[in-house]
Structure formats: C-alpha cells, structure tokens
C-alpha cells in the first residue's frame, strides 16, 4: 500500500510531503474531556497536604492552538488560593501525566483557576 505524496521543487532541491490518510480527528471537546479525566486522576494521586482528598475538575478549556489549557477546579471546604498554589507547584508533574495519556503533538501549559458558579451557570431545566 503506497502513501500519497506531493513533491514540490524548491530551487534544486525536492521536498517531499507525505499526505496523512484521512482518519478520525479528535474534536476540541473530546480533547478537553479526555484531559479532564486524566487530570482528575493525576490530581487525586498528588501527595501534597494542601490538596484535599476530593478535588473536582469542573472544566478544561484549551486554546485553538492547544498551547494553553485553563483548568477550572473546585473542592469542598478547601482553601482555594492554597489549593491553586499547590496545583501550580505540581504543574510539571501534571503536564507529564497529561502527555503520557493524551496523544497530542504538544502538551499545553496548564493554568489553574477556581470554578465559580457565575462562570458555569446551571443548565436550563436543571433543578439545582
């Protein structure tokens, strides 16, 4: 089975570009959902006393170029500035876990934010 390619002449050199076969591409929503699952389990494995036992990753928002990811977290009864500081301190380990479990060309830089009810309004028709 041959792979289609395109040859372009540039002065005396020939550059060959292999065209990728069309395949299933992951939509940004799918990438964000997978990142949320991986980060949830990675945060649960952190051994930092500033991180409570139950931390919820509410949402992950990735920029269109996948260069940065905003991770919105919440925890019941936790000191949020202290939690965000602990997660920022563990950013390298979390990014390594992310790169090991999510197939991406480049791993986005993580930014941690507190999840507010104002940023995430309730869905229409929800009872709480």
Curated annotation (Swiss-Prot):
It is found in: Cytoplasm. Coiled coil: none annotated. It comes from the Bacteria. GO terms for biological process: maturation of SSU-rRNA; ribosome biogenesis. Monomer. Binds 30S ribosomal subunits, but not 50S ribosomal subunits or 70S ribosomes. GO terms for cellular component: cytosol. One of its GO terms (molecular function) is ribosomal small subunit binding. One of several proteins that assist in the late maturation steps of the functional core of the 30S ribosomal subunit. Associates with free 30S ribosomal subunits (but not with 30S subunits that are part of 70S ribosomes or polysomes). Required for efficient processing of 16S rRNA. May interact with the 5'-terminal helix region of 16S rRNA. InterPro entries: KH_dom-like_a/b (IPR015946), RbfA (IPR000238), RbfA_dom_sf (IPR023799). This is Ribosome-binding factor A. Its main location: cytoplasm. Belongs to the RbfA family. Keywords: Cytoplasm, Ribosome biogenesis.
